[in-house]
Amino acid sequence: MAADPDCIFCKIVAGEVPCFKLFEDAETLAFMDINPVHDGHALIIPKAHFPTVFDIAPEAIAAAARTTRRIAQAVNAALKPDGLNLVQSNGPGAAQSVGHFHFHVLPRWNGDGLLVNWTPKPGDHAHIGEIAERIRQHL
């Protein structure tokens, strides 16, 4: 997909907006989030513009996943967090802040107060089965 002239991430890829670059290859760019949740909060993007997971080409998401793994390993080695979250949001209902597919690498420390956890509760198996069937119809 071509670059979007209004996309901040496309402007970063083009060198029009500076970033704290961590890694770059032919298909992806990894850089520090300038509004970090914690030290080490990094973003990984495909260089091509894809708004969401629903739009991204299979080869582009594979490249982004490879780079995400590499950055996660480096963050883990450099900062030694207690854990690490990978976050990828799609659309306003999921709080996607930039309309360019991206992964967040979020190092976590015990007691850091970041709330991305939910409490598992037993689901209704009949309902879960119905939802599974609805999803399978689209595969």
Model features per residue range: what roles?
Residues M1-L139:
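HIT superfamily nucleotide-processing domains
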